[in-house]
Design a protein with these regions (language model features):
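Charged, low-complexity intrinsically disordered terminal segments
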Residues: 1-409
Length: 409
């Protein structure tokens, strides 16, 4: 990727950069776009699939110019079929539908092939990120990408979860479009955002779609990036995204949030294994910050869980309050001093922080942070159990072993 600074795009430069993306070749380095602080008209925190899927579907069904979906996990099932039906209906109305999905998370060339054939036959343009050979196609049933190893691309997984409707409504969160997020087995959230900041989400999507070989007519640029009314856009909000290489604005922001907290700090994450970030959490607690760490009691990755639990003793000794949510807590969020909220897809483990495509929304608003506490943190705290230290020589040895392996997990 080269410089970690990336390409700085100001508020007036988004259209210019988008036009370059739509008319010329796009390399991986062109995805490294760093945005200045933006503005949102509204930011809503929606917790659990039963709360975020219905309005997300309603937004898709209301689309009049375009629907863009970037999803790590979009698979057949009750939830997936409902979304597929909504997308097919828009295609029948003549609305362009574009998708970027991850080969590992969505399996569009394997078990979900029929599901994606239905979408592409209806007219959806689908690009696939393949961690071993990130070569593109319009549709998922072309050349057999992924059969040939490309070690340089190993780990280039697209972990993002984004929906952009008409360039005016954006969704960013941690959940896939899959049944286990809709039936309560996985506990997650999405942020629904409107206002000028949606242009940033749209540009990130367009950059990835074009890098993967998708075609977007430059004549539609005005529809893709409609002029947003700034009059009511008073909420500071900025899109941060990581890309493979050395472009890691989310990682930088997480470190700053952990280091800058002075009064309170909430960390919500299913995979807390990065030693450097864990030490930052400990230091925050030691300097008197009230720290709550929300993690799952029953994680879906037992190796990561063992590595994480290895650090519980040091975290507890530092004064961190560990809260284990009873089901698979899958959300990723940070709240600093009741004012700053960072939420999206990035986990506190090495691959997310340094290798995957990730996306978060940074919101600097006491009212949005309070909304997060009311809808997520307070209810989660009420049903969570205190985190425990590993007990017994065997349990501690297993935890220590997996902690050593955590950069690979």
């Amino acid at each position: 990727m080269g410089s970690s600074l990336g390409i700085a795009v100001g508020p007036d430069g988004i259209r210019e950069h988008a036009e370059r993306l739509l008319t010329g070749p796009v390399a991986l380095r062109d995805l490294a776009v760093r945005f200045p602080e933006g503005r949102a008209s509204s930011v809503e925190v929606l917790v659990e699939g039963s709360s975020f899927y219905p309005p997300m579907l309603a937004d898709i069904r209301s689309a009049s110019s375009s629907v863009h979906v970037n999803q790590f996990g979009f698979r057949p099932g009750r939830v997936g079929e409902e979304f597929a039906n909504a997308l097919v209906e828009k295609l029948r109305e003549g609305i362009p539908v574009r998708l970027v999905v991850d080969r590992q998370g969505s399996d569009p060339e394997g078990g979900a092939r029929g599901f994606y054939e239905r979408l592409t036959q209806a007219g959806a343009e689908v690009c696939v990120v393949r961690a071993t050979k990130p070569r593109a196609q319009r549709g998922v049933l072309g050349t057999g990408g992924g059969k040939h190893w490309n070690l340089g691309a190993l780990g280039h997984i697209d972990h993002r979860k984004v929906v952009v409707v008409d360039g005016r409504i954006g969704w960013v969160g941690g959940a896939g479009i899959e049944d286990h997020f809709g039936d309560g087995r996985f506990h997650d959230l999405f942020l629904r955002v409107t206002g000028p900041v949606v242009e940033q989400l749209q540009l990130v999507f367009l950059a990835g779609f074009r890098w993967l070989g998708g075609e977007v007519p430059v004549s539609t640029l005005a529809e893709l990036l409609p002029s947003a009314d700034d009059a009511d856009a008073q909420i500071p909000a900025t899109v941060l995204h990581n890309a493979p290489g050395s472009f890691r604005p989310i990682t930088e922001a997480i470190g700053r949030i952990l280091d800058d907290a002075t009064a309170t700090l909430d960390v919500v994450n299913p995979y807390v294994t990065d030693r450097g970030m864990i030490r930052r959490i400990e230091r925050a607690a030691r300097r008197g910050v009230r720290v709550r760490l929300f993690v799952p009691a029953n994680a879906n990755n037992w190796a990561c869980a063992a590595a994480q639990q290895h650090h519980h003793a040091a975290l507890l000794d530092a004064g961190v309050r560990i809260l284990e949510y009873p089901t698979m807590l899958h959300a990723k969020a940070f709240v600093r001093d009741g004012q700053e909220l960072l939420a999206g897809t990035c986990n506190l483990e090495a691959w997310s922080l340094r290798r995957f495509f990730e996306i978060d929304l940074l919101v600097d608003s006491g009212s949005v942070a309070a909304q997060f506490d009311e809808r997520f943190s307070a209810p989660a705290e009420a049903v969570s159990s205190p985190g425990r230290r590993l007990e017994g020589a065997k349990e501690r040895a297993r935890g220590a072993a997996f902690a050593l392996l955590s950069p690979l997990l």
